[in-house]
């Protein structure tokens, strides 16, 4: 090794699954590592990259880090593929069969992205579901770190998949959805079959999506280290279970709040770092400015969820009939069928004009921190859950699939900062839950949510668990330089 290369910083390759929640979470990790003066090559799908450049400040945000570079690659799907709803799962075989070989070719042709000003890749931080990246790392002798973008509780339940199959809890059949699951250590008293990750809802244990989940989760242990976007005070008991199998585990979350904390420490002007694939309608912030404190229910089901027209109407009637103010994000592609919002009943239109506001996409982090927001009706995606926790906003959870099922159970049963509305979608239940969160038990939920928000912010402040763990991660990466 020449003397010039000896003085170069570590060079980390970061590779997320190309869907919004995963990309967003790993972009925050990339910026945190940039702040520690590491060089970063960020593998991003061409589709994701074009959306980020079009709809976010990502170009200006990373321009201040000369050691950062994007490296676009195909995700193997056609441009008109929705990448949402049930079809979002198409991304897994596509990345394995198309992106995987392209990635290997790219790494070889670019000599692991080494140059006169950049050392070869020091380590690969890959999304935990991209085992082909792990295969390449092992083949080339490059240290591997997996980043799991889901909650610790979801990861652990998936890790216990073989035991769940052996015990007969999977596949879930008949009317046994409320039976307590005993095969996930640390959750034996409260986890029901209906709370297991959505991929467990299959008729046959040989179903491909279940087998993919099982294989991808178990292979995580081959990595030299793992990263989770959570914090010790939130999921400590579950983290203790995971560390029995993966002792070098770095919890660095909530990453969006951690990034803000680090930027403030360095006296860098902080702008909320959106990673949205959709154009944000900021008019909703002006509307919120005119509403009383803690009076508005924010409604958003994330970047993947799709609803039927019947479900749309049940939610709409429930929100209007609750008598509460609401801000509702309705993605352009979030309604099944072509008729979508056509022929909306007049009473819904009138009720929305009186107390509601609807946009195609919102600056969510900013919205959740707005003083007018008093609750969040959410799909329980992990990024949204953490953003709500940091903002001190109680939740009503209507999970759609994947890790969202178990996240919603922890929100309601363990952390007690919200209500779980999974597997139901009728207007009477929605009215009841909205009123319970926003009126009847409002003070109780706000008090608990405020306490959890303080714990989250302490974790990412200097001396906090996540702050110290990120320092430890950086030191570990530096130790990998040969």
Swiss-Prot record:
An anthocyanidin binds at residues 22, 402. Belongs to the UDP-glycosyltransferase family. Component of the seco-iridoid and derivatives monoterpenoid indole alkaloids (MIAs, e.g. vincristine, quinine, and strychnine) biosynthesis pathway. Catalyzes the glucosylation of 7-deoxyloganetic acid to form 7-deoxyloganic acid using UDP-glucose as the sugar donor. Inactive with loganetic acid, loganetin, iridodial, iridotrial, 8-OH-geraniol, jasmonic acid, gibberellic acid, indole acetic acid, salicylic acid, abscisic acid, zeatin and luteolin. Gene3D superfamilies: Glycogen Phosphorylase B (3.40.50.2000). One of its GO terms (molecular function) is 7-deoxyloganetic acid glucosyltransferase activity. InterPro entries: UDP_glucos_trans, UDP_glycos_trans_CS. Disruption phenotype: Large decline in secologanin and monoterpene indole alkaloids (MIAs) accumulation. The active site is at residues 22, 127. Expressed in the leaf internal phloem-associated parenchyma (IPAP) inside the mesophyll. Mostly observed in leaves, roots and stems, and, to a lower extent, in flowers. It is an enzyme of class 2 (transferase). PROSITE patterns: UDPGT. This is 7-deoxyloganetic acid glucosyl transferase. Pfam families: UDPGT. Induction: By jasmonic acid (MeJA). Its EC number is 2.4.1.323. Pathway: Alkaloid biosynthesis. It is found in: Nucleus; Cytoplasm, Cytosol. Keywords: Cytoplasm, Glycosyltransferase, Nucleus, Transferase. Its main location: nucleus. GO terms for cellular component: cytosol; nucleus. UDP-alpha-D-glucose binds at residues 149, 362, 364, 379, 382-384, 387, 403-404. It catalyses: 7-deoxyloganetate + UDP-alpha-D-glucose = 7-deoxyloganate + UDP + H(+).
